[in-house]
């Protein structure tokens, strides 16, 4: 056999070795020559392909397995498929054993990322080793081509090639990716026959993971119980499955069993079981697991820290969660999102928005869930301007068509009284689902656009989407706020006929609809259909009695409420106000004395207004705590004078205390929404004035704000505890029905 001997008498410009024919060697000189050109500062195509082609033309044969492997490794390092193809051509020319060359070429092609060429080589092989089958199946699954992986597995079985532990541990993942449950069960049976289910931990772990993804935690647990040697991966897979399926008690039990069996948890075990503790609000076990995590050295692991943070937030221990967050050296997107969403869920919206701003300053890119949480924080506080800025961030990062960020925007604009802007966002969503439809329907409902809400509900039905309990509540609320009594009754009857599970909240909404329409007997009759009427249901009916001044019925309902919750302050306050509105001052004194004895306090009426991204708070009767109180009172007096010129007269029935008439007038002038509006007008805020109130707007303030909107020629949007009121040109969107 001929050989090319290297000497340095060749190209002096680049110091390349020359070759001459020698008959004593093999591929050593060839390999040295190949390595020399591979090390030059030239492109991979030049170093591998061109030089290799030159050698292949001049060489007679290449026969050493070691040298072929060396050349293929060089191609893998350079990720050169063209080099592999050249080697394959020369292997065929040299008569290299096909069963060896094929396997090596498939392996090299896969490592270079060309699965299709690897498959082409594989299909041309007459004999295929199990290792080659496994490699190709594993790479297909890794590159999300599970369907092809399963087809290859079927071909393997057809060719009477028995799978081994590596085949099965790979293909079980493909089955779960494609939801091929029946085929997965057949292959599980094959694993049992081959003795791999019990004896091999890789197969056992893959089976547990597969059944978990099918949502079959019972089957996953049976597999785990049969595996002889259990490890952390196996048990963690089951705990993750329990946690994801909401079987949190079982997740905690599995973790406890793990400790009994002396299997050391890893950071992912801790992360999963802590989420379950949070879902259960099981702070006892949560703190115990936190202690174990510290003892095991996993306290600084990011996955464990994030789950610990989430657990404390779900248990409403905000201070503990903040301490955990401060210990995270480099918080990532997931950590920030967990903190922000948890703070919003715990009613710490202002803090959540502060943390969101810190996240943006740290240049951590938010995801759609982060943005959705920040937007809900703005919507809960009616922070319109702040929300609009976050809308800009949503657009910047390309989430304006995302359903989660989109729903957050719809919720924001809906709760800031801008249903038209909410609808614009809704119409741009790339995917309409039940969540986005519910959010838009609720936006219409709370802003008094009942017909639009019902049209959207009809669209939902036509799209074939199944309404859920939120949909039903939003639709009934739309009818309630728009005085669509008959439509609401028809819908409620249809929901009952369709056997939709109706909750106490749905019944409370219908009781409110009928009660406000003056159909109190029907409303009371409806309560008899509820198996366990709760306080909300009875209070709703009691509120209707107050509106229509039905004292006798109210007293009867009050007795029922106090049987459920003795000393319920909301009920006593409602009854006190009802007695006051009907002139029964002796009963008012009696109720207030009872409240005093029970040390009950009425929640103060409060209003908020956002000015230049800063929220200002006003409390009824508090005239001097605000730094601009002098200017506010001057402006309020001027507004009251102008409104009286246009016919405003104080409605003294809204004062539930026995006092002089002039004192009643002063009391009405000091309501929190009046103070907030006076401040906003004094600050000369452009555009609409947006007020948020924690209680219902009283009749007197409602009448006054209507006139002020006409005086100032400004829209005033007031969101109270019940709904939105859009005041324009002396009228309100509610039609004086709230």
Swiss-Prot record:
GO terms for biological process: RNA modification. GO terms for molecular function: RNA binding; zinc ion binding. Keywords: Repeat. Residues 613-644 are annotated as: Type E(+) motif. PROSITE patterns: PPR. Residues 645-738 are annotated as: Type DYW motif. The keyword Oxidoreductase does not apply. The keyword Ion transport does not apply. InterPro entries: DYW_dom, E_motif, Eplus_motif, Pentatricopeptide_rpt, PPR_At4g14850-like_plant, TPR-like_helical_dom_sf. Pfam families: DYW_deaminase (PF14432), E_motif (PF20431), Eplus_motif (PF20430), PPR (PF01535), PPR_2 (PF13041). Residues 537-612 are annotated as: Type E motif. PPR repeats lie at residues 98-128, 129-163, 164-198, 200-230, 231-265, 266-300, 301-331, 332-366, 367-401, 402-432, 433-467, 468-502, 503-537. PANTHER family: PENTATRICOPEPTIDE REPEAT-CONTAINING PROTEIN (PTHR47926), TETRATRICOPEPTIDE-LIKE HELICAL DOMAIN-CONTAINING PROTEIN-RELATED (PTHR47926:SF342). NCBIfam families: PPR. Belongs to the PPR family. PCMP-H subfamily. This is Pentatricopeptide repeat-containing protein At5g65570. It comes from Arabidopsis thaliana (Mouse-ear cress). The lineage of its organism: Eukaryota, Viridiplantae, Streptophyta, Embryophyta, Tracheophyta.
């Amino acid at each position: 056999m001929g050989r090319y001997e290297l000497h340095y008498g060749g190209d002096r410009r680049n110091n390349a070795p020359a070759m001459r024919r020698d008959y004593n060697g093999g591929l050593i000189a060839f390999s040295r020559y190949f390595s020399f050109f591979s090390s030059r500062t030239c492109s991979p195509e030049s170093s591998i392909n061109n030089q290799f082609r030159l050698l292949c033309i001049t060489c007679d044969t290449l026969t050493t397995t070691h040298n072929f492997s060396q050349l293929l490794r060089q191609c893998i390092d350079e990720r050169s498929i063209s080099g592999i193809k050249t080697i394959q051509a020369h292997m065929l020319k040299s008569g290299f054993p096909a069963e060896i060359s094929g396997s090596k070429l498939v392996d090299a092609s896969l490592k270079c990322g060309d699965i299709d060429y690897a498959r082409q080589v594989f299909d041309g092989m007459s004999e295929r080793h199990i290792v080659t089958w496994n490699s190709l199946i594993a790479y297909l699954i890794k590159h999300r081509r599970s369907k092809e992986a399963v087809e290859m597995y079927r071909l393997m079985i057809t060719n009477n090639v028995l799978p081994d532990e590596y085949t099965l541990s790979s293909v079980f993942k493909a089955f779960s990716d494609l939801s091929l449950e029946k085929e997965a069960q057949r292959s599980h049976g094959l694993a049992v026959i081959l003795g791999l289910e019990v004896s091999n931990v890789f197969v056992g772990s893959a089976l547990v993971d597969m059944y978990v993804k099918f949502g079959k935690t019972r089957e996953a647990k049976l597999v785990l119980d049969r595996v002889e040697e259990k490890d952390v991966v196996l048990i963690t897979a089951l705990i993750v499955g329990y946690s994801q399926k909401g079987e949190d008690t079982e997740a905690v039990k599995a973790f406890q069993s793990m400790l009994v069996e002396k299997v050391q948890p890893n950071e992912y075990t801790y992360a999963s079981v802590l989420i379950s503790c949070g879902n259960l609000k099981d702070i006892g076990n949560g703190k115990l697991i936190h202690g174990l995590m510290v003892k095991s050295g996993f306290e600084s692991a990011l996955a464990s820290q994030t789950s610990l943070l989430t657990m404390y937030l779900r248990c409403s221990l905000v201070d503990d969660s903040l301490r955990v967050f401060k210990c995270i050296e480099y918080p990532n997107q997931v950590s920030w999102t967990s903190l922000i969403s948890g703070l919003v869920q715990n009613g710490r919206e202002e803090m959540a928005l502060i943390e969101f701003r810190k996240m943006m300053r740290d240049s951590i890119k938010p995801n759609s869930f982060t943005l959705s949480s920040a937007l809900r924080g703005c919507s809960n506080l009616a922070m319109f301007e702040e929300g609009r800025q976050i809308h800009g961030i949503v657009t910047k990062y390309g989430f304006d068509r995302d359903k989660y960020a989109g729903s957050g925007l719809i919720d924001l604009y809906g709760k800031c009284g801008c249903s038209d802007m909410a609808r614009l966002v809704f119409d741009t969503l790339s995917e309409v689902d039940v969540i986005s439809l519910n959010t838009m329907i609720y936006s219409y409902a709370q802003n008094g656009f009942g017909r639009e809400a019902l049209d959207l509900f009809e669209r939902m039905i036509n799209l074939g989407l199944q309404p859920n309990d939120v949909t039903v509540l939003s639709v009934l609320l739309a009818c309630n706020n728009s005085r669509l009594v008959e439509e609401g009754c028809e819908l409620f009857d249809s929901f009952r006929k369709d056997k939709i599970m109706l909750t106490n909240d749905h019944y409370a909404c219908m009781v409110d609809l009928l009660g406000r329409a003056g159909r109190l007997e029907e409303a009371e009759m409806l309560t008899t259909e509820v198996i366990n009427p709760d306080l909300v249901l009875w209070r709703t009916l009691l509120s209707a009695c107050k509106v229509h001044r039905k004292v006798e019925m109210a007293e009867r309902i009050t007795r029922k409420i106090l049987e459920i919750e003795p000393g319920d302050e909301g009920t006593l306050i409602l009854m006190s106000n009802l007695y006051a509105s009907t002139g029964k001052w002796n009963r008012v004194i009696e109720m207030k004395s009872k409240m005093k004895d029970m040390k009950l306090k009425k929640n103060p009426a409060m209003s908020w207004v956002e000015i230049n991204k800063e929220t200002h708070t006003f409390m009824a009767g508090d005239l001097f705590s605000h730094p601009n109180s002098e200017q506010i009172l001057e402006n309020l007096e001027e507004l009251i004078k102008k409104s009286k010129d246009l016919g405003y007269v104080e409605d003294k029935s809204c004062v539930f205390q026995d006092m002089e008439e002039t004192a009643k007038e002063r009391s009405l002038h000091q309501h929190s929404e009046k103070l907030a509006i006076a401040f906003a007008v004094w600050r000369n805020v452009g555009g609409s004035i947006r007020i948020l109130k924690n209680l219902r707007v009283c009749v007197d303030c409602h009448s006054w704000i209507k006139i002020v909107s006409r005086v100032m020629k400004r829209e005033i949007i007031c969101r109270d505890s019940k709904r939105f009121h859009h005041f324009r040109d002396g009228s309100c969107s509610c039609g004086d029905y709230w």
